[in-house]
């Protein structure tokens, strides 16, 4: 019997040593992702639709695209907050600052937190300032971008240091909920993030699949004490930024942030074994399809578009 280790086995070896994900990122699971005709077909449709959106964007012009994206984000706020935000298509940074400076209001705090995340994605993608981490410490830099404008309760919390305590995901507040998932042990975080970087650079997987699987793996690792959701979604948006464009990326942020319960349900199906990576990718790519449909609606305001 041959004892030669294949390239595929070598790429998967690290993942199979990761507690909590060894059942997900197996050689067989990654092979199924590569060979899934339904995923390949769905991605081909996504890219074709994106090309049509790009054609409309070019006719619309960058400033008008900025204006339309900002208006889309403003409309996510409640009416009182929306009236306080001015559209500044020439200055995405000023727009983000205005969203972050909305005065504290406990009744709209959760909605504002979600809209701040979308506004951050908009500002970074509009400025071409969002890229994938190049090393493990790059995840800390990504955290800083993902948490820009979020309240800091003290000098120590929240911050971009990797957590040094055990963490779990629960289905309700502490002492009232059930444990859904035990996150990676603190001692494993550096090694597992390095393995995540390997996944994100695996050219045998389509970029969209790398982006979505990278998000799932990041959620399993949960390397920070706070802001993991913001950072994980930002990571996925960064990975998609090489193939998709501002309106789609902003609308995808809306889909995954405003409808994050749906994404969470997909993660739970992975946890329980009721779904596999193919199912997870298909579900998240369906959200990307929805984002493209919303982007098309936004761009129609500047002219007619057919998809």
State where each predicted segment sits.
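FIC/Doc superfamily catalytic core
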Residues: 1-307
């Amino acid at each position: 019997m041959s004892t030669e280790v294949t390239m595929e086995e070598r790429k998967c070896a690290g993942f199979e040593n990761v507690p909590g994900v060894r059942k997900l990122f197996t050689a067989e699971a990654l092979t199924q992702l590569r060979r899934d005709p339904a995923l390949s077909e769905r991605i081909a449709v996504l890219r074709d639709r994106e090309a049509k959106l790009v054609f409309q964007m070019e006719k619309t012009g960058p400033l008008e695209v900025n204006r339309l994206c900002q208006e889309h984000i403003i409309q996510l706020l409640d009416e009182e907050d929306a009236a306080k935000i001015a559209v500044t298509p020439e200055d995405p940074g000023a727009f983000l600052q205005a969203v972050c400076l909305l005065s504290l209001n406990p009744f709209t705090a959760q909605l504002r937190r979600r809209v701040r995340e979308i506004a951050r994605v908009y500002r970074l993608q509009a400025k071409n300032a969002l890229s994938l981490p190049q090393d493990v410490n790059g995840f800390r830099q990504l955290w800083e971008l993902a948490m820009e404008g979020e309240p800091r309760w003290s000098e120590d919390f929240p911050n971009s240091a990797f957590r040094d305590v055990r963490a779990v995901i629960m289905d309700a507040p502490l002492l009232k909920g059930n444990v859904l998932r035990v996150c990676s042990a603190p001692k494993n975080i550096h090694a597992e993030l390095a393995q995540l970087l390997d996944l994100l650079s695996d050219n045998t997987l389509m970029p969209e699949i790398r982006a979505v699987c990278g998000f799932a793996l990041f959620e399993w690792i949960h390397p920070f004490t706070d802001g993991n959701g913001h950072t994980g979604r930002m990571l996925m948006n960064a990975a998609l930024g090489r193939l998709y464009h501002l309106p789609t990326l902003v609308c995808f942020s809306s889909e995954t942030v405003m409808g994050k319960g749906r994404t969470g349900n997909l993660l739970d199906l992975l946890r329980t074994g009721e779904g596999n990576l193919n199912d997870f990718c298909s579900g998240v790519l369906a959200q990307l399809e929805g984002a493209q449909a919303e982007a098309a609606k936004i761009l129609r305001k500047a002219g007619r578009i057919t998809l």
